[in-house]
């Protein structure tokens, strides 16, 4: 399905990807579960994550990075791509263990770690602009309590005209409800798994104590995607330099 042009209430027009109109009302496609991962494993995964090399100054979007209204949080890229839709294999054994427990039946596009310290938060954003894209978050900080803050909020998809144009099959489309409200919110209990449609506006609110909130994030799709391409292996059987340091080189 290609682009769809829709007339807005003010008489203007907006172009949206036609795939956004597939399926039904996505704004409540949010699920959470506890007890999927044993407590002793959570502690082990957290210890592994804390020994990794974290990158500072990360933001929820390039626009938020440019504005820098809040301090950036920490981040580790673990695999996959932001711009390419290719299925790939997870390289970290401990992450594979988690994915095997929480995979809702989607093909993985990207996975990474986010880390938020005291007073660090994200910004309201979307993870995807087309149908059939989902995000799965696993919270890994042991001993997290409600008073530690850091809850994730999910908002009505009407915060911008672009979101409203995309939300044509929800109650919040261009001619729908303009009230901006939180749909659901979850605190980051250790081991909690949260799954949601990538088109839902969401934000990780600030941590209130000295604890460090570690979130393992998986982004995937239920669409068919191609496998990650491997570098072709050259046939060097007739290479005159076979057995030397320049075998197979152009």
Indicate residue ranges for each PLM-predicted region.
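Catalytic core of non-heme Fe(II) oxygenases with the double-stranded beta-helix
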Residues: 96, 100-233
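Tryptophan-centered motif/residue detector
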Residues: 54-58, 143-144, 219, 250
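Long, low-complexity, intrinsically disordered segments
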Residues: 238-250
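Intrinsic disorder/low-complexity signature
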Residues: 7, 14-17, 72, 111, ...
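Non-heme Fe(II)/2-oxoglutarate
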Residues: 2-105, 232-235, 241
